[in-house]
Amino acid sequence: MTGKWWLWIAVMASAFDGTTATSAQPATPRAITNTAGLRLVVDADNARPVLRVLLPGKSESDRSIEVIFPEHVSGRRHAQADVEQLYLFRPGSSGARPAWRQQGQAVVYDMELAGAVRLMARATLEDDGVRFRYEFRNRSTVSYDMIYAVTDPRLTSSFHDVRLERTYVHHADGFDLLGSETPARLSMPLTNWLPARYLVSFTWPVPSQRVERRGDGITYYNKSRAVDEPFIATLSADRAWVVASVARDVGNVWSNPELTCQHVDPQVPLAGNGQAVTEIKMLIVRGSLADAHSRAVAQRMSLK
C-alpha cells in the first residue's frame, strides 16, 4: 500500500474512536525561567491543570513543588446553605486538556465550570515565586454569595514535612510551628497521626473544639489562637529554601501534613452576570523564614 492509502485509513479510523490522525490535544507551553533560575513547567502527565516549579539545577521531571491549579472550585448560591462543587481535579492523562497560552512570564488557560461560570486561570512566574490568579465570569443571573478556587501546592522531597516539624505560621508574637499544640504528633505512629488536617483561623472565629474526628475518617486539629497574617511556610530539610503561601484575606490557613500542602484560599462573592478575581502568591526563596515573611508582608496588599 502507498503512504497516502495508510494515511487515509488512519484518518477514517480516527472518525470512529474520537481521535485524529495527528494529535488534537493543545500543545504544552515551554518552561518559563526567572532571573533566580526557578522554572515554571506545565505538567504534561496530567490532562487537567497541574504546574511544577523547579529549583535551580533540578531536572524537568522533578516534582518537589507541584501545584494543582486548582484542586477544586466551589460556590454557594445566594440564600442557599449548601456549597456546590463547580469543578474537581482528577489525576491522569485522560480527558480534554485546556488550551494553555503563554503570555510573557505567565501561562494561562480558560475553562467552563458548572453553573454557567467561566474561569480564566493565570500563573505568573515572578522574581521570588509564582502568582496565581483566578478570574470568574458569571454567565447566568444566579448570584453566588461566595466562590473560591483551591490552589493546592504539594511539597515532596526535601520539603516533605509529614509531622509538621518545619511548617510555620505567624501570630502577633511571631512565628510558631503550625502543629506546636500537638507535641504527640512527633512520636505517635503515623497510622494514628494520619490522615489529618491542621487549621488555624485568620478572620474566622477560633473553633472551641481543638480536635475533631469527623465521619470522613480525618482528624481535624484547630490551633487555639488565630494568626495575624494569612501566611504559611515550609522550610526545606537543610533549611536552605522556603516555600510559603500568602493571600490578602482568608478565613483560615491550613495544611494536610501527609501532602505537605499549603492552603490560603480566598473566597469572594460573584454577582449574576458579574466578574470576580482572587489571587495568591507562592513564594520560593533561598533564605530564611524571616526573608520569606518580609516578602509576604510587602506583597500581600498587592494581591486581589
Annotate each language-model stretch with its function.
Residues 125-126, 130-186:
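Acidic (Asp/Glu-rich), glycine- and aromatic
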